[in-house]
């Protein structure tokens, strides 16, 4: 991105610009600092003109807000829409950036989780969003079923659509309710709600079988991670299987997935 704009922005302006952007379907999602607010249209037009599979350019307009983790976006250039179909790992996901939480940055992490699912497993994703884990696992694993839930009605509606879009209806049970209402016995349980995950640890231990595996996402610095692990162990007997760094959130703070087995 910086190379593209070398003739349009000053050296100090280029220094403020991030090197890359997220592409979600046909939408380019940029992070533009306030200092470059007056230059955002130039930046957006450059992206639109130079990336053939980009039809819309937006910028992140807020921090991730509320229990639904939605981060609003502002339209900058191209086709005026925030809805798109995102393709990753052999599946298609329809979504609206202003209505649901979605990040393409976890696509390799989702594959990692898929590769741990065994034949006959019951997999539960109680904060599933539009279904990136649930649909992927239903389509490419030999699990018995996937229980997919999200409290956000918009995310649930897209989840229902994505189950149909990927023809995995027979393998996914979809719900739109509070995760605390569940009492299932899953072999694999995905807890991808990093900001609030610690307040759902009791839900995780209740809904996973003995010897079942939990994928517990959290935000922490490397120094804070041992505290997060102590918090997990304080909620039930378990063994830590792995600690996977899934990208950075801010300087020194990372998204982690702590995989643990309930004992």
Annotate each PLM feature.
Residues 1-263:
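SAM-dependent transferase fold signal centered on methyltransferase-like domains
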